[in-house]
């Protein structure tokens, strides 16, 4: 009985860890997007529209 309970708790912890990692990845993506936008203002040419680029990236994701 004790062994069964232990395995059950382990599976639950694994699921929780997976959820946490997912949220962390989402937050990192948001942060990277802001940083890239700031950098793109300097690096990219004026003719390339930023709105179209962001829309394409979002659709790809």
Swiss-Prot record:
Residues 1-61 are annotated as: Disordered. GO terms for molecular function: DNA binding. PROSITE patterns: PROTAMINE_P1 (PS00048). GO terms for biological process: chromosome condensation; sperm DNA condensation. InterPro entries: Protamine_P1 (IPR000221). Its main location: nucleus. GO terms for cellular component: nucleosome; nucleus. It is found in: Nucleus; Chromosome. Testis. Belongs to the protamine P1 family. Protamines substitute for histones in the chromatin of sperm during the haploid phase of spermatogenesis. They compact sperm DNA into a highly condensed, stable and inactive complex. This is Sperm protamine P1.
């Amino acid at each position: 009985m004790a062994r069964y309970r232990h395995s059950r708790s382990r599976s639950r912890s694994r699921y929780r860890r997976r959820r946490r990692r997912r949220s962390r990845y989402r937050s990192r993506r948001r942060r990277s997007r802001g940083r890239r936008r700031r950098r793109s203002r300097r690096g990219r040419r004026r003719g390339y529209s930023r709105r179209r680029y962001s829309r394409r990236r979002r659709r790809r994701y």
